[in-house]
Every structure is written in structure tokens, then in C-alpha cells.
Amino acid sequence: MAAVRMLRTWSRNAGKLICVRYFQTCGNVHVLKPNYVCFFGYPSFKYSHPHHFLKTTAALRGQVVQFKLSDIGEGIREVTVKEWYVKEGDTVSQFDSICEVQSDKASVTITSRYDGVIKKLYYNLDDIAYVGKPLVDIETEALKDSEEDVVETPAVSHDEHTHQEIKGRKTLATPAVRRLAMENNIKLSEVVGSGKDGRILKEDILNYLEKQTGAILPPSPKVEIMPPPPKPKDMTVPILVSKPPVFTGKDKTEPIKGFQKAMVKTMSAALKIPHFGYCDEIDLTELVKLREELKPIAFARGIKLSFMPFFLKAASLGLLQFPILNASVDENCQNITYKASHNIGIAMDTEQGLIVPNVKNVQICSIFDIATELNRLQKLGSVSQLSTTDLTGGTFTLSNIGSIGGTFAKPVIMPPEVAIGALGSIKAIPRFNQKGEVYKAQIMNVSWSADHRVIDGATMSRFSNLWKSYLENPAFMLLDLK
């Protein structure tokens, strides 16, 4: 009996020590009703002792966390809040979309890192948010088993837990992606996600659409190949793109932001560069014929084939011969860096303003590869979903002003690049061949600008002549393709 009493006394003291140790390691503790609990941290014995059950604040009612705007790279310090995907009181899970923000370079979707309830939004639409400052307050979810007795909580095997997670897992996708899928009658369960943890991205939906039969309605070949004859000059009436704004008699002042703010910064730096201009005329008659032959083949692969892939590939072949045009200079023009990759930018006119995504590594891409990438960039650009990667890292730029209707331009270099080309519209103009015969020629004008601090006129002229020869005689490109 003495031995039993001694063991009971030792056990009671040990239990108190364990309680005290547990109490000291748990901050912000609440006291609940007395209960029996087994401290599983000591496997050598099991001990049940009446005491006040302990629980942390976070486990009791959830902890409010300030979700801050993290660094999104490229030296971006502030962004504009363009759209909220949540409101106060909404429940969110990890990787759910919180909002869409726009910097001076790209639009970015911010996703949650926590499971919980939105308690506060710090910004209204079009407000400026700063990196490192709170975006929202999220009350994290309390643990469901935190109020249960540890002794009575059944252990779940690893296999059972895994099975329940897989069975109950929901498809990961942002509201914008779900909306796009719904508009095109696509079941998200049929789409393979390429994002983190199988998240379905907008590119996955677009790729799924391209692979489906009839997902992209083909235009009538007759309409494309045999366009209706143009109206006489005297009957041509300019069509207004949009209605003129109604004059209210009041001036309106608003801040410059988004892509327009980026243009202010870039163009201000660009105009410090001494520009050298060079113009030429390109006969694209043979290229027009070649494209008409290749369009049905590209269309069968689900790709729209424009002239731009040929322009980009010809430029890349020219840059191999004149690498100084694929270079960049530092701010004070003390050092020049010759770029190994040909990341050729394409100026695009969008509702948000001028953006310049670029096709990466054109030097190792085929015409079809370039066309595929251009299709992707154009689709993402039309819905303002281009990533920062798509919009940065350019080494050379082409601006297709002719798609709007221009013939000549004076393009402005995008620093730190050293050259840019502007392409005019293609027009049918009478020209003489080598026999002196008049024929219908497809003429396009090109306007080049180069940084005259490092590029001389002869270099720009030789590059343009080489680029011109590839386009006027497309078969020549076959000799240099790699």
C-alpha cells in the first residue's frame, strides 16, 4: 500500500509539472471547464488528471491576419487595384483569388495564402496599393478538433486521410477562369491544370478550346481569299470608331496610372536618346502568295497565321548578322550588353493602352512556333491577362502600325533597347518588274529608329536590306533557318 500511495503521489506531481509546462508554452491561454486529458507528449505513461482545459486564442475564435501585398518583382513598388474578387464576410481558401492589381507593366491576380474569412478591405477600386502594406484582413479558421479531448480523438490513418482529401478536393481556379469556362460550356473537371497544385489557368482553358473540334469557328475561305472590290474613292465615307464624348462644360482632372503611367516613364527616358531614322519600301508580293498557301495548313492546326511571324523570323535572322541591334545599353551609355536571346517585342494596342509583350527566343523558333506564341499573347492581351514575364525582357521591337492603317511612322526606342521598327499597311500599288512590265505589287513601308550613340546609319541600312531580302524572297529564309 505504501508503494501504491508513493506512486500516486509521484504521478500527481508529474501531472502538475506537465500541466505547468504546457501552460508556459501556450501563450494567450483561455480556461474552460474541468476535464480529463492525456498529455501525449510523454509516451512512457498515460495519465489522466482533472484540471482546467487549456486552449489558445487562435484555436478558439481564429486569428486575424493582415494579408500584405508582397513583392511582385521588376522593382514594382505600387499597383492600382482594378478588381476585387471578394468582399467583407466572404470565406476564402488558400490560392483563392483576392483581387486583380495593375502595375505599370502588367496585370497580376493576387491569391490568398490563408483559409478564413475576409474581415476588412483596405482599398477601393482604382486606389493605389503599396508593396508591403496590408491588402485585406483575414480571420483564419479555428481548428475543428481543438475543443475535443485528446484521449477521445480517434487517430486517422494516413491512407484514410489521403483518400478523404482526394475525394473532397475541389477544382482550383479563379473566378475569371470559371467564368470563361462557363461561357464556353467547359467542365473544369475535364481540363488539366498547369498551375500550382493543379490550378487551372486561363491559358489552360484557351488551349482546351483550341483542341476541341469546332471550338474556333473557321472564317469563310471565299471571303478571305476573294475580298469584295473596294468602293470608289469618291464614295468612301470615314466611319467613326466611337461616338464623340458629350461636352458637359466642365473640365475633369484624373491621375495618370496603369499602363499610361508606364508610358510616361518609358517615353520620358526614350526621348533622351538621339534617334536615327531610316525608311524603306518592301515588295511583299511573293510573301502574300506564300501566306495564302500556308494559311489552311496553320488553320488545321488551330493557329491563325498572320504576316508577323515572317517579319519576326526575318528580323531574327538579320540580328544574327548584326548583333549590335540586339543589344542594350546602361542608363549613362557607358556599357553595351549583347543579348544572346532574340526576345522580339510586338507593340499591341489594347483597351488599357499600349503594351509590348515579346516572343522569347525567336532565333530557335519556327514560323509556326512564333505564330502559336503570337496567338497566345494576343488572346491574353485582349483580356488584360499578360504576365510580367510576357511584358519584360525584350531585346528588339517591331510595331505594326499598319494594322490600324498607317503607312509611315517615327517609332520611339524602348530603353534599354537600341533599335525599333514600325511596319506600315500593305497596299496594292503598280510597279515595274525587271522586264519593264507593270504588275500589281503588294508594298509595305518600314520605318526604323536606332540609338545613334551606338548604331550608325550604314549598320541600320545593311540590316534593313538583309531583312528586306528575306521578305521579298521567302525561299531565301530556308537557307539560313536553324
Swiss-Prot record:
Modified residues (N6-succinyllysine): 133, 196, 261, 289, 440
Localization, UniProt: Mitochondrion matrix
Assigned EC number: 2.3.1.168
Substrates-to-products reaction catalysed: N(6)-[(R)-dihydrolipoyl]-L-lysyl-[protein] + 2-methylpropanoyl-CoA = N(6)-[(R)-S(8)-2-methylpropanoyldihydrolipoyl]-L-lysyl-[protein] + CoA
Region (Critical for association with PPM1K): 145-160
GO CC aspect terms: branched-chain alpha-ketoacid dehydrogenase complex; cytoplasm; cytosol; microtubule cytoskeleton; mitochondrial matrix; mitochondrial nucleoid; mitochondrion; oxoglutarate dehydrogenase complex
The Lipoyl-binding domain, residue ranges: 64-139
GO molecular function, one term: dihydrolipoyllysine-residue (2-methylpropanoyl)transferase activity
Record-level GO BP terms: branched-chain amino acid catabolic process
Phosphoserine: residues bearing it: 220
Residues bearing the modification N6-acetyllysine: 196, 202, 243, 250, 289, 295, 304, 435, 440
Compositional bias (Basic and acidic residues): 157-168
Ranges where the Peripheral subunit-binding (PSBD) domain occurs: 172-209
Entry keywords, A to Z: Acetylation, Acyltransferase, Disease variant, Lipoyl, Maple syrup urine disease, Mitochondrion, Phosphoprotein, Transferase, Transit peptide
Location of N6-lipoyllysine modifications: 105
Residues that span the membrane, as ranges: none
Pfam families, sorted: 2-oxoacid_dh, Biotin_lipoyl, E3_binding
Major enzyme class: transferase
Transit peptide stretch: 1-61
Cofactor(s) needed by this chain: (R)-lipoate
Annotated consequence of substituting residue 152 to A: Has no effect on the interaction with PPM1K
Disordered: annotated span: 147-168
Family: Belongs to the 2-oxoacid dehydrogenase family.
Reported function: The branched-chain alpha-keto dehydrogenase complex catalyzes the overall conversion of alpha-keto acids to acyl-CoA and CO(2). It contains multiple copies of three enzymatic components: branched-chain alpha-keto acid decarboxylase (E1), lipoamide acyltransferase (E2) and lipoamide dehydrogenase (E3). Within this complex, the catalytic function of this enzyme is to accept, and to transfer to coenzyme A, acyl groups that are generated by the branched-chain alpha-keto acid decarboxylase component.
Illness the protein is tied to: Patients with primary biliary cirrhosis (PBC) show autoantibodies against the E2 component of branched-chain alpha-keto acid dehydrogenase complex. PBC is a chronic, progressive cholestatic liver disease characterized by the presence of antimitochondrial autoantibodies in patients serum. It manifests with inflammatory obliteration of intra-hepatic bile duct, leading to liver cell damage and cirrhosis. Maple syrup urine disease 2: A form of maple syrup urine disease, an autosomal recessive metabolic disorder due to an enzyme defect in the catabolic pathway of the branched-chain amino acids leucine, isoleucine, and valine. Accumulation of these 3 amino acids and their corresponding keto acids leads to encephalopathy and progressive neurodegeneration. Clinical features include mental and physical retardation, feeding problems, and a maple syrup odor to the urine. The keto acids of the branched-chain amino acids are present in the urine.
Identification of the protein by name: Lipoamide acyltransferase component of branched-chain alpha-keto acid dehydrogenase complex, mitochondrial
Native species: Homo sapiens
Designated gene of the protein: DBT
